[in-house]
From Swiss-Prot:
Further information: EA-R is part of the restricted EA-complex.
Record-linked Gene3D superfamilies: Blc2-like (1.10.437.10)
Keyword annotations from UniProtKB, A to Z: Apoptosis, Early protein, Glycoprotein, Host membrane, Host mitochondrion, Host-virus interaction, Inhibition of host apoptosis by viral BCL2-like protein, Inhibition of host autophagy by virus, Membrane, Modulation of host cell apoptosis by virus, Transmembrane, Transmembrane helix
Organism from which the protein derives: Epstein-Barr virus (strain B95-8)
Origin organism lineage: Viruses, Duplodnaviria, Heunggongvirae, Peploviricota, Herviviricetes
Protein name in UniProt: Apoptosis regulator BHRF1
Chief location: host cell
Motif, BH1: chain positions: 89-109
Annotated family: Belongs to the Bcl-2 family.
GO cellular component terms attached to this protein's record: host cell membrane; host cell mitochondrion; membrane
PROSITE patterns: BCL2_FAMILY, BH2
Superkingdom, natural source: Viruses
Length: 191
């Protein structure tokens, strides 16, 4: 079955919230799940495999993720629209790659985790952020469909395999592009 990027990312954020949260799902994620009924469960094999892959990317690049997110959230004025702006900076040539897609998904999952686990984050900031990342991510759907869908892409990346290692490596390199794009976006927005 072909899943949209929105469905995959939302299921990943819900899964991640259950793993790293305080046992309850953030109300914004509950609302998003009601607005976009999921055709796959956060416990689905596809979601679990992507979660492992994205966790590895986040763990290997934790300082970069934290620094980039802090810079983004500190300098953004319209968080929902700004997710789309960063997405457009990363994929502006219309030439996505698996590394870019995974770096983007990992950054979004990390952002969602950071926002949902921080009790002092205002509801509206979490709401606008989750909406912004889900909407921006829909821009990957055409490319993902051409690659055979999210399910096909993860089947080729089994943890421990050579391809899995290369995927992690390429996603790490692509993360630097994410950092550069977010800095460019932020500095452009300040002038």
């Amino acid at each position: 079955m072909a899943y949209s990027t929105r469905e995959i990312l939302l299921a990943l954020c819900i899964r991640d919230s259950r793993v790293h949260g305080n046992g309850t799902l953030h109300p914004v994620l509950e609302l998003a799940a009601r607005e976009t009924p999921l055709r796959l469960s956060p416990e689905d094999t596809v979601v679990l495999r992507y979660h492992v892959l994205l966790e590895e990317i986040i763990e290997r690049n934790s300082e970069t993720f934290t620094e980039t997110w802090n810079r983004f959230i500190t300098h953004t004025e319209h968080v929902d629209l700004d997710f789309n702006s960063v997405f457009l900076e990363i994929f502006h040539r219309g030439d996505p790659s698996l590394g870019r897609a995974l770096a983007w998904m990992a950054w979004c999952m990390h952002a969602c985790r950071t926002l949902c686990c921080n009790q002092s984050t205002p509801y509206y900031v979490v709401d606008l952020s989750v909406r912004g990342m889900l909407e921006a991510s829909e821009g990957l759907d055409g490319w993902i469909h051409q690659q055979g869908g999210w399910s096909t892409l993860i089947e080729d990346n089994i943890p421990g395999s050579r391809r899995f290692s290369w995927t992690l490596f390429l996603a790490g390199l692509t993360l630097s592009l994410l950092v550069i794009c977010s800095y460019l976006f932020i500095s452009r927005g300040r002038h």
